[in-house]
Amino acid sequence: MELTLGDLQQIELICIEASAWGLREEVVDEAETLINDGYQPVVAYEMAYNDWVK
């Protein structure tokens, strides 16, 4: 699957916001698991962020 520049920017913004909460590693780890489960990368990062940063 190829990611667009917009996808990469959105993922990076999610990671920056997660980092502000000290949760970047947790969000990335969960997003990678969700991607392996078949979710689209941007959706996976959004879900992981929403799960960790409530």
Task: List each model region and its residues.
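C-terminal alpha-helical interaction appendages
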Residues: 1-54
